[in-house]
Swiss-Prot record:
Family under the similarity heading: Belongs to the LplA family.
A GO cellular component annotation in the UniProt record: cytosol
Species this chain originates from: Escherichia fergusonii (strain ATCC 35469 / DSM 13698 / CCUG 18766 / IAM 14443 / JCM 21226 / LMG 7866 / NBRC 102419 / NCTC 12128 / CDC 0568-73)
Residues where (R)-lipoate binds: K134
CDD domains recorded: BPL_LplA_LipB
Domain BPL/LPL catalytic: 29-216
Protein name, UniProt field: Lipoate-protein ligase A
Gene Ontology BP, a term: protein modification process
Amino acid sequence: MSTLRLLISDSYDPWFNLAVEECIFRQMPATQRVLFLWRNADTVVIGRAQNPWKECNTRRMEEDNVRLARRSSGGGAVFHDLGNTCFTFMAGKPEYDKTISTSIVLNALNALGVSAEASGRNDLVVKTAEGDRKVSGSAYRETKDRGFHHGTLLLNADLSRLANYLNPDKKKLAAKGITSVRSRVTNLTELLPGITHEQVCEAITEAFFAHYGERVEAEIISPDKTPDLPNFAETFARQSSWEWNFGQAPAFSHLLDERFTWGGVELHFDVEKGHITRAQVFTDSLNPAPLEALAGRLQGCLYRADMLQQECEALLVDFPEQEKELRELSAWMAGAVR
């Protein structure tokens, strides 16, 4: 029986693809070597320990229907669209070796006519007249008996959108998380006009087979045709949840301030695991009582626009005469944290 396994996803859903990756990684025999090829539609993928409010322009993502997906590996934030090809190599130890998977991808690029080289710990670069340009970034995860290396190849990604979603709003965030380094990147289509996802997948597959000296049939998977993966439904539910994608953010603080016709407002939030652990409100309003009450209500609240609005509007029962002020405050807060 072959020790190789090849899976190719027909789904563009990042939560589906990352859930498949997680299930296979947890359940594969330690003797198996797996290649999983996939791609995502319009998604910002962040590292396991990153803060989405710090890394991403979450407001623009919401406006443009761009998803957020937190992966289980470390590293920085990246934007995925259908101009990217994603790969995951998995193996049990001691077989797992990220230098092997890196060489497989480099051999695949070479077979396509692109001379690339590894740079640093995570990147593949090509040399251009303007200097080195990144065409691939990677991240890694290891447990006691297995490991995986996953990464992205830029084929024809919309690099302007990449900059849009990875340059955050100028929010006053004093975060304990790490801000990603924005790398100089280029698309493979600049070097190989017309190159397709299918061609890249075929080249990586052939390099994978050549390295191990055997071949297997590809398993084509999609939400309608999932492989036999115990606990997949639970893994997908977690991968697609707000609690995982946003709530796992490192602790951070957020300062909001605005001047309204009825007075200035300054809000200080401390946020842990997506919940407000402390809220302070400062104002020169002639009637500060609703704002003081709001500070109490926001303690323990999810750091989410709709939940902040809900808590603010709940104060209308106790402060009906301040309806105009509370609705202005509600709309402003919701816009500021998106």
